[in-house]
């Protein structure tokens, strides 16, 4: 029907996007001339942007760091324009924040002090969940585990920056693996199963009191499956 055809035309053709977006971004990047707005974005986001662009340039691509800064600049610019449009229509956007970060990522690469590591900078433990009726060996997620004592000493600065940035992008934030803030399951690094893991205390309400003190009352959804 014509109605169905109209709906189809409004949908994103992700296959075509995947095939062409990097090529078009590179073309746009080489034509781009940094302006004051771009320079302000780089300055305002220097606490994460420099590490991210260096990481992406060295590990994921042969493109220069400035290319990835350019991509982030336009993503944020377009995303916030979309968010304002939605908010003006009375629509709130819900984001999703993972509890852990990846071993192969900027946080672990540049900030080993945030995690439980040995003298060589390797994880001593990783995250997961214990054996249960659904998985007799448990689950080994292989994410580095936070050194919560360090985070507490810094008044959770890294977490405050992370959450603040996400609440700039979203109106409501779903916190994945919410129980990890209370207790998290810690598994020896290198173990293939979760059999020899154990529960450890997370930051609890201390982190959220610090969050409220810094950012005020915020809309949070607590994931309740684990």
What does each model-identified segment do?
Residues 2-8:
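Short, small-residue-biased leader/transition segments that mark boundaries at the very start
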Residues 14-23:
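Non-ligating segments of multi-cofactor redox enzymes
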Residues 24-226:
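Active-site and adjacent substrate-binding regions of carbohydrate-active enzymes
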């Amino acid at each position: 029907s014509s109605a169905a055809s109209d709906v189809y035309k409004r949908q994103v053709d992700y296959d075509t996007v995947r095939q062409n977006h990097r090529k078009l971004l590179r073309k746009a990047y080489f034509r781009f001339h940094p302006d004051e707005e771009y320079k302000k974005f780089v300055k305002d986001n220097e606490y994460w942007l420099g590490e991210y662009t260096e990481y992406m340039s060295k590990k994921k691509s042969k493109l220069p760091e400035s290319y990835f800064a350019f991509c982030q600049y336009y993503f944020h610019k377009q995303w916030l324009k979309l968010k304002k449009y939605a908010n003006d229509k009375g629509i709130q956007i819900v984001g999703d924040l993972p509890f852990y970060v990846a071993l192969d990522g900027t946080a672990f690469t540049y900030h080993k002090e945030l995690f439980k590591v040995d003298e060589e900078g390797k994880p001593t433990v990783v995250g997961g969940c214990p054996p249960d009726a659904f998985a007799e060996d448990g689950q080994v997620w292989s994410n580095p585990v936070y050194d919560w004592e360090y985070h507490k000493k810094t008044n959770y600065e890294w977490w405050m920056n992370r959450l603040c940035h996400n609440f700039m992008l979203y109106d409501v934030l779903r916190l994945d693996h919410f129980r990890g803030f209370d207790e998290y399951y810690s598994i020896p690094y290198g173990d293939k199963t979760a059999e020899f893991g154990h529960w450890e205390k997370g930051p609890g309400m201390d982190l959220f009191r610090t969050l409220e003190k810094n950012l005020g009352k915020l809309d949070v959804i607590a994931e309740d499956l684990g």
